[in-house]
Amino acid sequence: MCAYVGVDTSCYTTSVACVDECGIVSDLRTVLSVKQGERGLRQSDGLFQHIRNLERLVPEMFEKLDVGAVRGVCVSARPRPNEDSYMPVFLAGKACAASMAAALRVPLLAASHQEGHVRAALYGNEFLMGQPFLGMHISGGTTEVFLVDEAFHITLLSGTEDLHAGQFVDRIGVAMGLRFPCGKQLEALAGEFDPATGGVKLPAIVRNGVCSFSGVETRAQALIDDGIKHGEIAYAAYDCMARTFGKMLLY
């Protein structure tokens, strides 16, 4: 039985996992802690938290792992598959993975965080492997449409001219008093609103395939200040993003 270990230390989750020929053996993750009212962490603080989290998560992963079966360790070494792509938080995972690979005497496989997202989306959809397809990566630091070719090379097609979708969500959420990162909480609020009752609308701004959330965020902040119910604004935000992404993909 062959097994592979994976490590990812991104903004804002520490993740370690192991898979074998039968599937997922272990999948452990911890969200980084951000103080109430703040909209993120400095890279140095994120790096420190990742190191502390790995100290706990890695031994827990090895409890379920047959060490002798490990054939490689894969790590997200950078945000995107570009030579100039760099973010300090990924150094925590890279150092941890390199140490594990050296100790186990197996290869270290370096990938990018974005490639990991794409491959995770293909889990259960392997029929897409080996053929070109359109992909979209949406997070706090990325809002991109790209083409993935037969060799799994990623070519950027479009993105955002200002805020990323995740930043849009987090800024609205923090203004509502939610804890960063706000995605799950804002999504829950949106689920409480009944669109059949009407509600406010936020514009979906896309120019030449490139989106913009800066002006939309300003409008959403004004709605919060005006006392519009948070669930209604949350629904409007997700409706806006859905229409925005649709325009980007159809461009």
Each predicted region: which residue ranges?
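A short helix-loop
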Residues: 2, 9-10, 27, 129-131, ...
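General beta-strand structural signal in soluble alpha/beta enzymes
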Residues: 6-7, 75, 108-113
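Short glycine-rich, Thr/Ser-proximal phosphate-binding strand/loop in the N-terminal lobe
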Residues: 10-48, 153-156
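Conserved phosphate-binding loops in N-terminal lobes of ATP-dependent enzymes
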Residues: 40-42, 46-67
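Short beta-strand-loop/turn "lid" adjacent to the catalytic site in phosphate-handling enzymes
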Residues: 59-98, 102
